[in-house]
UniProtKB/Swiss-Prot annotation:
Phenotype upon changing residue 586 to F: In GT2; uncertain significance
Transmembrane segments: 719-741
Residue numbers of Phosphothreonine PTMs: 767, 779
Name of the featured protein: Integrin beta-3
Consequence of changing residue 749 to H: In BDPLT24; the mutant protein is constitutively active; spontaneous FAK phosphosphorylation; abnormal cell shape
Domains (record comment): The VWFA domain (or beta I domain) contains three cation-binding sites: the ligand-associated metal ion-binding site (LIMBS or SyMBS), the metal ion-dependent adhesion site (MIDAS), and the adjacent MIDAS site (ADMIDAS). This domain is also part of the ligand-binding site.
Residues annotated for Ca(2+) 2 binding in this entry: 184, 241, 243, 245-246, 277
Expression tissues: Isoform beta-3A and isoform beta-3C are widely expressed. Isoform beta-3A is specifically expressed in osteoblast cells; isoform beta-3C is specifically expressed in prostate and testis.
Cleaved signal peptide residues: 1-26
Effect of residue 605 to S: In GT2; type II
Motif placement: LIR: 777-783
Amino acid sequence: MRARPRPRPLWATVLALGALAGVGVGGPNICTTRGVSSCQQCLAVSPMCAWCSDEALPLGSPRCDLKENLLKDNCAPESIEFPVSEARVLEDRPLSDKGSGDSSQVTQVSPQRIALRLRPDDSKNFSIQVRQVEDYPVDIYYLMDLSYSMKDDLWSIQNLGTKLATQMRKLTSNLRIGFGAFVDKPVSPYMYISPPEALENPCYDMKTTCLPMFGYKHVLTLTDQVTRFNEEVKKQSVSRNRDAPEGGFDAIMQATVCDEKIGWRNDASHLLVFTTDAKTHIALDGRLAGIVQPNDGQCHVGSDNHYSASTTMDYPSLGLMTEKLSQKNINLIFAVTENVVNLYQNYSELIPGTTVGVLSMDSSNVLQLIVDAYGKIRSKVELEVRDLPEELSLSFNATCLNNEVIPGLKSCMGLKIGDTVSFSIEAKVRGCPQEKEKSFTIKPVGFKDSLIVQVTFDCDCACQAQAEPNSHRCNNGNGTFECGVCRCGPGWLGSQCECSEEDYRPSQQDECSPREGQPVCSQRGECLCGQCVCHSSDFGKITGKYCECDDFSCVRYKGEMCSGHGQCSCGDCLCDSDWTGYYCNCTTRTDTCMSSNGLLCSGRGKCECGSCVCIQPGSYGDTCEKCPTCPDACTFKKECVECKKFDRGALHDENTCNRYCRDEIESVKELKDTGKDAVNCTYKNEDDCVVRFQYYEDSSGKSILYVVEEPECPKGPDILVVLLSVMGAILLIGLAALLIWKLLITIHDRKEFAKFEEERARAKWDTANNPLYKEATSTFTNITYRGT
C-alpha cells in the first residue's frame, strides 16, 4: 500500500484515529497483510492488532486481526491477546503552599512517580504540575574575578552580604551566602614567571603588592551569618594574570561539583553568581600551556580550599558545565561588564537556566542585579528531560496562566511566586528494545523535585508463558506449540510441522509460485514441502507466502528508510501517525508552525510538512515571525508590551496574554543597537505617553522585548507658572495698552504741532497800528495859535 496523506487528528485522539488510519479505514487491513506468523510479531504491527491463540479458530481465519474481527470469527475472548497501554500514578504528594519549615517535605512537582506500559507504536498521555512555592530556601554563592582590573569592585562589595540579606529576606526567610574567587591557571603563558619576584608579586612593576596568582579558591562556605561574608570579603586582595581571558569556567565547575565544600543544600534554590569584566578560557585553551588532559567534572578542591588540578587539567567545555549545573540544580547568573555582555549572552543561550546582567564598572549595582536575576528565574518554569530512551519520543503542551493550553511548549513565563502551571506530555514508543523496562526523568530547570517515569515496553504476549516445547500438537514433537500455532524446529515446515525438508517432490514446486511461469518463491527462497522458505538477508526480513515482500526495499530519504517515520512493507512505506508522503517525510502536525503570537506561521504563510512557507513579502524566520517591513511588525508586539509590562490592553482583558505573548520582557533605561535583526517600535498609550521598545530574537530563537522603563509622557501644567504667566500677561497687556495710548497721543500731538507750525509759517502780517491801541499821550493842535 502506497503511503498517502491522512487527515490530521486532534491531539487528544491521535492514538485512536492514527491507529484506525492504518488498519482498515479507507485501506487494507494492516493486521492481515503483514504476513506475521507469531503473536509477538502481530503486536508490533499496530496498536489495533490482536492475536487469537484459540486452537478452535476456524481454518483459514487469520490469527492476527482487529479484535472485533477475531470475536466475529468466534475466537474465545480469553484467548485474545490485546494488551492496552496504560499510565498509572505511583506517587503523588500534594503540592506545597510554602517553603518555610521542614524544607525536605516541600513539594513543587506533582506527581513524583508514574508507571507507563506501552505496546509497540502506541502512545499514552500523562501530566505534571509545577508550583513555585513561597518562602523557599535560597543558597547564593558569589564567585568573583580577583584579577587586578576588579580592584575597585572588591571594595564595592565589602558590605554586600548585609545588603543582600536585607533584600533577599523580603523573598525568603531562609538564606545562605558564600564566597569564592578565581584568577587563572598559575602556569605560563597565563601568569608572569619572570623576573623571579613576579611569582610572589605579579604587580611588581606597578609599584604595588598583590597576591600570587591562583586558579580558584573557596573562601566561605554557605552560611546564614551574613556578617561573615563581609568579613571574608574585606580580607581578600586582588592578583594579576598575564593574558586577557580569565579562568572562570574552572571556578564554575568546582563551585558546582564540590557540594560538601560549598555547602549546597538539597532542599534549596541554588544561585551561582559569576562576576567578571573579561572573557574566559574554554575547553582546549589549556593546550597553550601544554595541558591536554580533559576536564573530568570532578571536585578537586583540597584541604587548603584551592583547586589542585588547575595546572594539570584543561578548562571544562560548555557541554560538561551544562550537564553538571543541571545535575546539581544550579542557576548560573553571569554578572558581567558591558564590554563582554554579548559573549556571555551567547553562553547563556547554550546553558539552560542561566541569566545575564550588566555589571557596572565598580560592581555597585550587583545587589539589584542579583535580586532581578532571582526574580527572573522564579518567573519561569522550563522542563528538561534526562535519560530518555531512544525508543521513546515526547511531545509537550503547556497550560500556563488562565488555563490557556499552548501546544508544543514546555515552558511558562511571566509567573508569580505561588502560581501553578501544568504540562500535558504524550509518550510514544517505536520498536521493542531488548531491555523491557527503562526509566527517565522530567524536571523543571533549577528544581530538585522531579517526575520519574518508569516505562515497561509491552512487546510480549501472555500466552508465550504457556508455550509447550516438543509439543505433540506439532507432529509429535517437531516444534513448540505457542499461542495457538506451532513454531517448528530446524528442518521442519508446515502449520503443524508435518513436513520435513528432506521430503522433496518436484510437484511441490507449483505450489511455490503465484502463477504459472512466475519465479519460484520470487527467486528469494527455497520451495520445501510446497512452502516457500525465504532466504535470510543482511538488509532485513523477507516475508510473504511467495517471499514477495521485504522490509528493506522502500525508498530512503536522507539515508533513512521511510525517513525514519514509517515501516517498510512489501516495498511501500506505511507511515506512522502524523506523517504522510511517499517517503513519510511530511508531518501533518502544525504545532511546529505555531508562532509566539498563537497564529499559524504568524499569519504570514502556510504550514507545509511541519514548516512554514512564508507568503507575505519581507517575512522570514522559522514561523515567518520576522518581518521588519510588515505594517504589523510593531502592532502586535505593542499589545504584548501593554499586557506583560503594564498589565492592561486587549490581551490582558481577554486573559490571553500568555497564550499569544511568549516574549521575554526586559526593562532598560535606553534602547541599544542589538543588530540588524532588531526592530525598534514606538507607540502612544492610553495616557498619551510615548512608549519605546525593541523587538529582538537571539540566535537560540528566544524572543526578547526590550522596553524603556519610563514612557515619555507630556508634563502637566505648573500652576505657579500659569498664575505668574497670567499675571505677567495682564501687566504686559496693560503696559502695552498704555504705551500704545501714549504713542497715539504723541503721534497726534506731533501732527497738531506740525500743523500749527505749518500754518504759522504760512501767515504773513502787514505792519500797522492796532486800532484798539491808544497811546498814553495825545497831541492836539490849537488852530488859533499862530505862534510868535
